Amino acid sequence: MSSLMLRLLPLLYIISAHFVLHPETSPSLIYEIGSIVTFHCRLETTTNIRSVSWYNKNRLISNHEVQNMDNLSFTDDGYVLIHELNKINNLAVDSKLYFHIKHNRTTSLLKIKAKSAYDATCLTCTFTVDNEKTSATSCLKLFMKPIVVLYFRYLDNFLDVTCTVTSYPKPNVVIKFLGEVYKRDIPIVRQNENGSSTVSVNFTFKRRTKLEFVGKTVSCLASSWFTNQKASALVTSGEHTVQNHDEYSKEGVKSSNSDETVFTWTVPLILILISVIVLLISVCIVAFKS
């Protein structure tokens, strides 16, 4: 062996000794509140793994110690080494560790049920390989689809419309009526126990005649993060409540109310048709008597 190779051997040993694989994980997870969330962390090796740990900030929440892999019996798909239950802020944590010998891969799975918006958090998984530690962090984002409730009633000569929406994050709420969009700069907002917000918007519309608004479409439109929901109803002569989870396009907010246009043209045509029928019947009766 040459003198150059002899001098390079210590350097190669130092480099190889400090070369550590980095875990693979999803940096960002998006789930709906109430879902079971799965954090996963994978390392492309099954050699010399001493432990796999999960941390919530600096607090240890799950730890798998690997004592002696030689005594483990592996299946073709992998072997579940430890099944562990723990707590994160009173949340049940279901943690499992898999060794996939065929693929030379170690995977750690950690499951929680996200009950509220406050369960959104970042978890860090740490693999200890020999005496080296290598980590990766995954952050959870939560959302709640808007629950939309539309209510209207008459107060003397006014149509009173209230739109109430519950979602997370806090929704933007508008009322659409007679082709116009109405919103409040400062709506009524209530915070709920699960971290969601309930936003209420109210408007009154003066009617010139008793039946002016009957048959017109009134809609409650809500947008929260990437989700749009609405509730719509035809105005009646009394009070009415409707709850809906239909999705809508934001373009619909800008467009005219097609339902009202159809109603505006349909009613006069029906009245004209009825008048013609009555006139024909009258002519027939007169002709028959004569």
Curated annotation (Swiss-Prot):
This is Putative OX-2 membrane glycoprotein homolog. The chain crosses the membrane at residues 268-288. Gene3D superfamilies: Immunoglobulins (2.60.40.10). InterPro entries: Ig-like_dom, Ig-like_dom_sf, Ig-like_fold, OX2G-like. Residues 146-236 form the Ig-like C2-type domain. Glycans are attached at N71, N104, N194, N202. Residues 18-267 are extracellular. Residues 23-135 form the Ig-like V-type domain. GO terms for cellular component: membrane. PROSITE patterns: IG_LIKE. Residues 1-17 form the signal peptide.
